[in-house]
Amino acid sequence: MGPGEDSSTLSVLRPATSGAASHRAPVEAFPPVYRVFRDAAGVLLRGWFDLRVEGVERLPLAGPFILAANHHNYLDGVVLGVAVPRPIAFLVMPRVFRATPLHPPFHRRIGSIPVALERPDPGAIKRVLEVLHAGRVVGIFPEGPFSQDGRLVRGRSGAAMVALRAGVPVVPAAIEGTYEALRGRRFYLPRRRPLAVRFGEPIHFGRARRGPIARTEREEITRRIMSEIAALLRVHPGPAAAAGRAGAS
């Protein structure tokens, strides 16, 4: 982001307000498809995979925020969708959004936002800002594509940029067990493994920003987000994982 932004993207921004409290709104209802899928997945994850959720009390009950989590595979979104008591608009890569003919209508019905990683995507960022200013939750995996070895990898700066542009907090989240559940599995059928997700305290970065945002600032905020995720995973992020890089998710 940054170079790919245009006036239509920035026009989404409303006058700056202080903190999530100014965005308070009634908790939004789950879209019907989202609710049915979430209920079914919840029974499976809690019963078969013994899903444990820690820190859910740290999640804002209303108002917009960005949920930033580590990323192993498709199960991560399912785990977060079950654990978070509000609907999440996830950023997804186009190839995931259109993986099969059934994927696009499914993703549209649950509110997913396709975003390109290899180039600036101001249209996607505009949609993200619209979702946030509607008081909703956006889910971003700062690492971008799936981790290939289950370890935390370097974060992209998209979550930091969106947080600064929208003036909303970032809630870090750490997901455990999904990599082991799908490692080496055919047909995407997970093996039985305990799953866990931990939520950290919301990180606030101040009021919405309209002007240019320095790359060094985006990278510093990305390092903080990745460090918080690493702390929840109880691992050291290392210089590669903590460093920021350009990208929308």
Place the predicted regions along the sequence by residue.
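Non-catalytic C-terminal accessory region of glycerolipid acyltransferases
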Residues: G2-V33, G123-S249
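A transmembrane-helix-recognition feature enriched in membrane-embedded lipid enzymes
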Residues: D6, L10-L61, A99-I110
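Short, basic, glycine/proline-bearing loop/turn elements
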Residues: A40-G42, R109-V115, P142-F146
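Catalytic core of membrane glycerolipid acyltransferases/transacylases, capturing the structured
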Residues: R46, P60-R119, R127
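A generic local structural motif
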Residues: L51-V56, L75-G77, I125-R127, R183-R185
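Conserved beta-strand scaffold positions in the cores of enzyme catalytic domains, especially
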Residues: V53, F90, S112-P114, V170, ...
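A secondary-structure boundary/capping signal
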Residues: G55, N70, V92-M93, F141-P142, ...
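Residue-level "edge-of-site" marker
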Residues: E57, P120, E176
